[in-house]
Amino acid sequence: MDQARSAFSNLFGGAPLSYTRFSLARQVDGDNSHVEMKLAVDEEENVDNNVRSNHASLTKPKRFNGSFCYAVIAVIIFFLIGFMIGYLGYCKRVEPKSECGRSGDSKEIEGTEPPETEEYFPETPSRLLWTDLRTMLSERLTATEFTNTIKRLNGNSYVPREAGSQKDESLAFFIENQFREFKLNKVWRDEHFVKIQVKGSNAQSSVTVVNGSGDMISLVENPTGYVAYSKATTVTGKLVHANFGTKEDYEALSYPVNGSLVIVRAGEITFAQKVANAESLNAVGVLIYMDQAKFPIVNANLPVFGHAHLGTGDPYTPGFPSFNHTQFPPSQSSGLPNIPVQTISRAAAEALFANMKGDCPSSWKTDSSCRLEFPGDKNVKLTVNNELKEIRIFNVFGVIKGFEEPDRYVVIGAQRDAWGPGAAKSSVGTALLLELARIFSDMVSKGGFKPSRSIVFASWGAGDFGAIGATEWLEGYLSSLHLKAFTYINLDKAVLGAKNFKVSASPLLYSLIEKTMQEVKHPVTGLSLYRDSNWINKVEKLSFDNAAFPFLAYSGIPALSFCFCEDTEYPYLGTTMDTYEVLSQNVPELSRLTRAAAEVAGQLLIKLSYDVELNLNYDMYNDKILSFVKDMNQFRADIKEMGLNLQWLYSARGDFFRATSRLTTDYKNAERANRVVMREINDRIMKVEYHFLSPYVSPRESPFRHIFWGSGSHTLSALLEHLKLRQKNSGAFNETLLRNQLALATWTIQGAANALSGDIWDIDNEF
């Protein structure tokens, strides 16, 4: 090393004994370069000793060669050291998580032990596959657990549990404690003070037959059941039968109903719709009964319960939440009836038929005892003595927070209360809710399941009175919910039979539902739930008495409800016979069917909360809009006679189609790993439903603003009905109203197209 140091010193002029000079100067008289190398102490010594010292001149090259080699070696060593330092520093800066300079093919020397140093292995985030998650869910679903939970919920501790009762509150606290035991990320409850209608405490309601002078001939019944939100009054009139009380039934009648009491069969449509239809034709009151043909119940004296509010939520705080001490002026929903309505037993209905004449049409397929109308010398007197009562209700919540987007969530819920035992109506749904909360919490804590988005479990209060708990929650937090909640799954009445699997849902969820039906097998047949490729055309609209309805029609949140059921309606809903024993007798495979319902809901939850892309198929609304345009084309002649045309509707429809196509292109080109880009696309998708809420009507006056699934003159169905009225009864047709309906419907579709396009500079429409 000393020799190398000496050589290095000599190279840079440290030693005066010798040096090397390279002359690269070009010759003046030629193009060739000349290189001259000299070794000397100095130039003078070199000249003086040039001839004299031959020996010295022979030995000097040896000194030079050794020094030069050492110098070159030193330079190379320093160069290599510098190169290695620079290379290692570069690796650490550019690839901090990789093993720099390590060859994957290197092997340890035999007979030597590796150094006792801790090696760094980078953590690669593992993402569970769909098959893994599906198996994880299936392994945790136990049929007996569902049966045990249903039994427990229908024990004496929680039955009966009418909304606001002590047993209803006890069950709410039990569910809250269960959520805490399941170790959900957060558990809470909110309370509302609402008005419901109950049976009168001072006087009974009654149905009597009277003569022309109003004197009582006979007491038919003092009903045990009742219809909440009926007008409390007394009316008298001729009794006429109107089958189920649908609009089509009234159109087929050969006698008027104005000024008369109407008796109708339960089923087909809700109690509230039956009353609204009768009131629109100036009937003075409505009686509702369950005929044996549709509801084959042995007990002819079985009482029935329901409600007559054509809407959801507390009807005395329409459009705003029923929190305590809210300072709103007294008001009431426009969906409350102005006529009395009462349920009666089948025995009471048959007693009334005994005084009536005219056989019911065979097309009604009802009991042989059915009759059409009272004779002219007799009437029926109806007295309803229901009372308003303010109660406190609870909604109970638990959440599993998402790991990447906790502020986006899917909500799954079930009604908790019931007028009777409520086994099929609320216990099955509540059991599903509890078991799914337990299972998903276990999947997260022990199975490695990491949902990207949050899952909210909700137990609703006062569901029997028109989804009051769910609606009040939506009204209270509407400003944030439509930005964050992207799907609601309803578990109410999920198991009512075994033959069929039926779904009611937003079109955005059709594709996801179809995939789920293909994955889940029917527990009885062993075949896939997906049996009919035309199932979408058989999907029924969500009804007013379904808790999923306000999510879709009021809040613009995609919602779905499903059930295992028979071809006929389950006869014991809303009666005192809705017990666990009756349910298990009518549905022998109750435990297995409940497990299958949980598997359906569970798979939906996984796909909605876990997948990078949001499983909402916005293309389905292209079909809905196209179908509406085709229906409108049938009235082109009428529209032309009014000096109107459908060009702007065609343009709006085209813009919506282009917007969906552009979004599909953006989605296909997006980098799945880029969560920011995917979130922006998903946010555009999740707001599609919301943009079909008409911005031109008041949420208070017309709370169900959805133009496809809502209720009111702003809906597309109301527009079509109005055009039909021009052909049937031109005197009742209002051209100004129709012009407004067409313009606002067109602009709502156009607004949805613009919103779906993204930023305003990306909007490219022909409107």
Curated annotation (Swiss-Prot):
A lipid is attached at residue 69 (S-palmitoyl cysteine). It is a single-pass type II membrane protein. Residues 96-110 have a biased composition (Basic and acidic residues). Residues 111-121 have a biased composition (Acidic residues). Residues 89-767 are extracellular. The modification Phosphotyrosine is found at residue 19. A motif (Stop-transfer sequence) lies at residues 60-63. GO terms for biological process: intracellular iron ion homeostasis; iron ion transport; positive regulation of B cell proliferation; positive regulation of isotype switching; positive regulation of T cell proliferation; receptor internalization; transferrin transport. GO terms for cellular component: external side of plasma membrane; melanosome. Residues 230-320 form the PA domain. One of its GO terms (molecular function) is transferrin receptor activity. InterPro entries: PA_dom_sf, PA_domain, Peptidase_M28, Peptidase_M28B, TFR-like_dimer_dom, TFR-like_dimer_dom_sf, TfR1/2_PA. Stearoylated by ZDHHC6 which inhibits TFRC-mediated activation of the JNK pathway and promotes mitochondrial fragmentation. Stearoylation does not affect iron uptake. Glycans are attached at residues 211, 258, 324, 734. It is found in: Cell membrane; Melanosome. Its main location: membrane. Keywords: Cell membrane, Disulfide bond, Endocytosis, Glycoprotein, Lipoprotein, Membrane, Palmitate, Phosphoprotein, Receptor, Signal-anchor, Transmembrane, Transmembrane helix. A motif (Endocytosis signal) lies at residues 19-22. Residues 576-767 are annotated as: Ligand-binding. It holds the Pfam family TFR_dimer. Cellular uptake of iron occurs via receptor-mediated endocytosis of ligand-occupied transferrin receptor into specialized endosomes. Endosomal acidification leads to iron release. The apotransferrin-receptor complex is then recycled to the cell surface with a return to neutral pH and the concomitant loss of affinity of apotransferrin for its receptor. Transferrin receptor is necessary for development of erythrocytes and the nervous system. Positively regulates T and B cell proliferation through iron uptake. Homodimer; disulfide-linked. Binds one transferrin or HFE molecule per subunit. Interacts with SH3BP4. Interacts with STEAP3; facilitates TFRC endocytosis in erythroid precursor cells. Belongs to the peptidase M28 family. M28B subfamily. PANTHER family: N-ACETYLATED-ALPHA-LINKED ACIDIC DIPEPTIDASE, TRANSFERRIN RECEPTOR PROTEIN 1. This is Transferrin receptor protein 1. The lineage of its organism: Eukaryota, Metazoa, Chordata, Craniata, Vertebrata. The gene is TFRC.
